[in-house]
């Protein structure tokens, strides 16, 4: 797998905070949700907000979205769901085989141009401390983020990430 050089995922400061709070609150399972934003004419994703979704499996190694929850969010943000995220609380540092199959199915077979963020654990901080640290402007512990997109012609590619400052 190669890193796609020309495209980026831009993540707003507010979206990043929501991602971090979600993965730390649900640190024992694969936290998951969708990314809200836009895709520009060059194929760059701009994540402006995050909408956490329930993982009905409550599993540290597997996630799925409840289809009704996903439909509700899609209706709430028409044409603005641009991707999905989930955590790997066990620290697995790349897309799993299941992740890869789902990325190919969504991006290539269904032709949905989502970007995929994986946030790697472990997430061993108390979420209430994270909120206090945010309020005091302290530095949050930053887990590693990986972004992917599965292109029809290039296969699975890692996408560069850029996080906006506050």
Language-model features, listed with the residues they occupy:
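Conserved beta-strand-loop surface patch within small alpha/beta domains used
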Residues: 1-81, 90-166
């Amino acid at each position: 797998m190669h890193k796609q050089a020309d495209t980026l995922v831009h993540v707003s400061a507010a979206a990043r905070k929501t991602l971090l709070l979600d993965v730390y609150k649900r640190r024992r399972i694969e936290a998951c949700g969708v990314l809200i934003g836009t895709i520009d004419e060059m194929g760059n994703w701009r994540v402006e907000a995050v909408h956490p979704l329930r993982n009905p499996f409550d599993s540290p190694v597997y996630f799925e979205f409840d289809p009704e929850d996903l439909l509700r969010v899609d209706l709430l943000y028409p044409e603005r769901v641009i991707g999905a995220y989930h955590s790997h609380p066990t620290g697995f540092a790349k897309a799993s085989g299941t992740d890869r199959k789902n990325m190919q199915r969504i991006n290539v077979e269904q032709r949905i141009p989502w970007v995929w963020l994986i946030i790697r654990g472990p997430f061993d901080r108390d979420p209430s401390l994270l909120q206090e640290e945010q309020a005091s402007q302290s530095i949050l512990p930053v887990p590693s983020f990986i972004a992917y997109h599965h292109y029809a012609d290039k296969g699975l590619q890692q996408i560069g990430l850029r996080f906006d400052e506050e």
